[in-house]
Amino acid sequence: FLDYLDANNFASSKIVLTKDGQAITSWHNKPIMIKEFLHGAISHDLSANLLTDLGAELAKLHTLSAPDYLPQTVSYGIERFDEVKVYAAESCFYAWLKETEVYIEKSMSSNLPKSLIHSDIFCDNIIISKDGKTATIMDFEEVSYYYRIFDIGMMIIGTCRSDGALSLEKAKYLLKGYQQNIKLQSNEVKALQAFTTYGAAAIAFWRHQNFNYVNIDTTMKDHYLTMKNLADDVMGISHAQFQRSLGIDILKL
């Protein structure tokens, strides 16, 4: 997939091919892939200019045709929330997750545009250049063909926080950059708050399942609470305030 991005002039990690032109080789009987080193650093406090540029990059990604081999769901999507029943059917978390699912599904529609999406753009998946002027999105392990508004909502959760709280001011710059290349449809504007909640709830689901069931780690068992609380915070904002703060008031479309 990284070759596909490179062929379409989307800046990301680049694969180093073997002498015989192969992308994958083996080391001690294990498949490996070597990528060019990206010089720079990770920042959890992105500037307004970088957020604007990243928004434009996300829109550029969404304009690429989605290869047929991509999955059409995300690996921690709403379709999998019921997996919590296997190990925590009576938990407060599962009850909360189902209530949140109802809230999200009210904004889901077959009319919402779908595209190639990254689905996991957090600050940890972005490399900032040494001069602080450019940002490169990497780690496309969760790429899929899904609602593009999910990608936007997830990126807001992943990159637009200040002291742990959602920053609508930062998100405004992200959307400003995005809409330089893609103008949000009115149904996407209406759904963005729910899909921002979806992004946080999806990560909360993954963390809860991973650290309490799949790869049990008692030191991380409550790690999901950060995202659960963030989802609650997003749902607690009035719809009108959410749109106005992001500069996407539906009345102005």
PLM feature segments, named:
Residues 1-68:
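ATP-binding pocket architecture of kinase catalytic cores
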Residues 15, 102-150, 253:
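Active-site acidic catalytic loop and adjacent metal/ATP-binding pocket
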Residues 31-45, 81-83, 201-218:
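A glycine-centered beta->alpha junction motif in the catalytic cores
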Residues 44-94, 112-114:
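A cross-family kinase active-site recognition segment
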Residues 95-103:
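Mechanochemical coupling/switch segment within NTP-driven translocation systems
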Residues 149-183, 198-215:
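Active-site activation/catalytic loop segments of kinase-like enzymes and analogous catalytic loops
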